[in-house]
């Protein structure tokens, strides 16, 4: 029984191991990937992910607004938008279908995983979409470089 469980866990690890990347991997590949900051905070925290992003983010990171980039005509928060809207959002962010992407957040609500799910749902290759283990908190704890520069992106053509 324990051997079977270990084999199942190993199979899952082999299949999905690139979904989570560590800070050293990102630091070594920072100019080879697109980086998305998807920080979102519960309203009662009175924190604003975008304001925090403008003050400090991982170099080259593009901000993804989880509120604005979700379906807006519903009372339920953060519902998936329609495919055409998703294509426009990604295209405006300069994301292309073959881009390797690392997503992180600066929150305790794992909003980066929501963005990861959206990308996979709309057809981005799961092997090209990663979540940064520990997010911005771990990045800063390890004294890695942060930035406050506005990232300028070229519009791309993204297809879902």
Q: What is the role of each PLM region?
A:
Residues 36-37, 63-65, 102-103:
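Structural recognition of the beta-strand scaffold that forms the well-ordered cores
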Residues 54-93:
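Aromatic- and Gly/Pro-rich amphipathic surface segment
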Residues 52-55, 121:
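A general structural signal for stabilizing positions within well-ordered secondary structure
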Residues 35, 61-63, 129-131:
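Conserved beta-strand scaffold positions in the cores of enzyme catalytic domains, especially
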Residues 43-46, 70-73, 109-113:
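Short active-site-adjacent helix-start/loop capping segments
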Residues 39, 67, 107:
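Anionic group-transfer/hydrolysis microenvironments
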Residues 77-160:
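Thiolate-centered catalytic microenvironments shared by cysteine-dependent enzyme domains
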Residues 2-50, 137-160:
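Flexible, polar/low-complexity N-terminal or interdomain linker segments that lie immediately upstream
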């Amino acid at each position: 029984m324990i051997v079977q469980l270990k084999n199942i866990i190993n199979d899952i690890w082999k299949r999905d191991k690139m979904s989570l990347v560590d800070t050293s991997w990102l630091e070594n590949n920072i100019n080879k990937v697109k980086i998305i900051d998807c920080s979102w905070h519960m309203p009662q925290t009175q924190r604003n992910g975008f304001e925090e992003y403008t003050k400090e983010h991982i170099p080259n990171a593009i901000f993804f607004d989880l509120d604005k980039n979700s379906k807006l005509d519903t009372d339920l928060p953060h519902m998936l938008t329609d495919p055409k809207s998703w294509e426009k959002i990604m295209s405006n962010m300069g994301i292309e279908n073959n881009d390797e992407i690392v997503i992180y957040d600066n929150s305790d609500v794992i909003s980066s995983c929501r963005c990861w799910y959206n990308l996979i749902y709309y057809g981005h290759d799961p092997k090209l979409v990663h979540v940064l283990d520990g997010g911005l908190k771990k990045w800063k704890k390890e004294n890695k470089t942060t930035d406050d520069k506005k990232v300028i992106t070229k519009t791309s053509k993204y297809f879902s």
